[in-house]
Design a protein with these regions (language model features):
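Feature captures the catalytic ectodomains and active-site-proximal regions of enzymes
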Residues: 1-260
Length: 260
């Protein structure tokens, strides 16, 4: 199984620009695709935690990267992630950069993101995307049974540059190119599950159901905010995914005979 997370990806950019995003376009043509609406607060840390635990935000209780002025750690999340339930002796699983906490979570892969994974500098974000692409391809060359990776760069770019449509679109082109490389390791004629998704969409401030971040932050003015409508693309996934946690439930069902 291959699971690719693209933090903050939105159909509002992808669909109008399909002709410039050939790999997103191919996924839309050859896979099932739709909007996944996040009914709970569309913040990255709790949503990715739901995706990778199979639990709702209420069930896992993880609210944000920082709670009561304290940076959260893995030990602060009172829940098991799917890779912790799956037996490593039975399933070769490699997990890269799940942004439930900082630093992001990895499993059976050694990796350190550029700038501790929190940079908003465009050059560093570009370096970070390329580094994660290279590590992902290195891991995929090994042919793991379960591979998951999350790319965070679109979220950072969107927050600070949402008012610059061409710049944001250029970063979607970069992400599309990364997808093309990763999908070289997926056989579209096989019965292997493939999931590509985001944790939330993106929009101007005030367009989403709830405001997740203020417009003014210590890092600068934010030009956009999270939207509850996320991207969901699946192939060979015979499971009714209505909420983020359903992704984790599907993963656990798929490997139910290999749980530890």
């Amino acid at each position: 199984m291959i699971l690719i997370g693209v933090d903050a990806a939105t159909w509002d950019i992808i669909k109008p620009h399909r002709d410039e995003l050939p790999n997103f376009s191919r996924l839309m043509e050859e896979c099932d695709h739709r909007t996944l609406t996040v009914d709970e607060k569309p913040k990255s840390a709790p949503v990715w935690t739901s995706i990778f635990t199979g639990l709702s935000q209420e069930e896992h209780g993880h609210r944000d990267f920082i709670v009561d002025d304290e940076l959260q750690k893995r030990s602060d999340i009172d829940a098991e992630f799917v890779w912790e339930k799956i037996d490593d002796d039975k399933v070769d699983q490699r997990i890269l950069q799940v942004p439930a906490v900082y630093p992001q979570l990895n499993h059976n892969v050694d990796y350190e993101p550029v700038g501790y994974g929190v940079t908003s500098d465009l050059d560093e974000l570009d370096e970070d995307m390329e580094k994660l692409r290279e590590k992902s391809l290195e891991v995929l060359e090994d042919g793991p049974d379960f591979f998951a990776v999350v790319f965070m760069q679109l979220d950072k770019v969107s927050h600070f540059y949402w008012d610059d449509e061409e710049l944001v679109l250029d970063w979607y082109r970069k992400m599309d190119d990364v997808l093309g490389d990763l999908l070289e390791h997926y056989d579209f004629d096989s019965d292997e599950p493939l999931i590509v998704l985001s944790d939330h969409g993106f929009a101007e401030h005030g367009e989403g159901r709830v405001q997740t971040l203020p417009e003014e932050t210590p890092a600068g003015e934010l030009k956009g905010d999270h939207h509850e409508d996320a991207v969901l693309i699946t192939k060979n996934v015979d499971y009714d995914i209505e909420d983020p946690e359903d992704v984790g439930k599907f993963v656990l069902e798929h490997y139910e005979e290999q749980l530890s």
